Amino acid sequence: METIGFHYVVEAAGCDPEILGNADKIRQIFLEAAKVGKMEVKASYFFKFSPTGVSGVVIVAESHISIHTWPEKGYAALDVYTCGTTADPEKAVDYILDKIKAQYAHVSEIKRGIEEDDETFTHMILTWEEKLERKNGDEKS
């Protein structure tokens, strides 16, 4: 059984609130994450809420990367979905988590569009949690 795509659903906590509240910084991180994950960027849009929070999406040839942030809680909800075999969505997820300085991540990997013999599509979910070895004050490159 082959899969059509990989969808990473990520809960990130203990993130740097200053980064989560900065739409330009989040855009920069996401565009670089697309490169790191070997994705071809087609478009992007990021919106800064008042008084706080950012929502944004990068459309890539392989699908999309999106985020919704709650800086006051140090929390971000991420989606990274790719189709095909050239992209590396896990590298993009790791890059984003590092740059937003997440202390904790709960990641679900969903294999989307697994074709069964009777031409129905199912998906498989793999979930893991990580306590990340970084502190908000630490600068990692």
UniProtKB/Swiss-Prot annotation:
The modification Pyruvic acid (Ser) is found at S63. InterPro entries: AdoMetDC_C, AdoMetDC_fam_prok, AdoMetDC_N, S-AdoMet_deCO2ase_core, S-AdoMet_deCOase_pro-enz. Binds 1 pyruvoyl group covalently per subunit. Pathway: Amine and polyamine biosynthesis; S-adenosylmethioninamine biosynthesis; S-adenosylmethioninamine from S-adenosyl-L-methionine: step 1/1. The record marks E62, S63 as: Cleavage (non-hydrolytic). SUPFAM superfamilies: S-adenosylmethionine decarboxylase. Its cofactor is pyruvate. Keywords: Autocatalytic cleavage, Decarboxylase, Lyase, Polyamine biosynthesis, Pyruvate, S-adenosyl-L-methionine, Schiff base, Spermidine biosynthesis, Zymogen. HAMAP family: AdoMetDC_1. This is S-adenosylmethionine decarboxylase proenzyme.
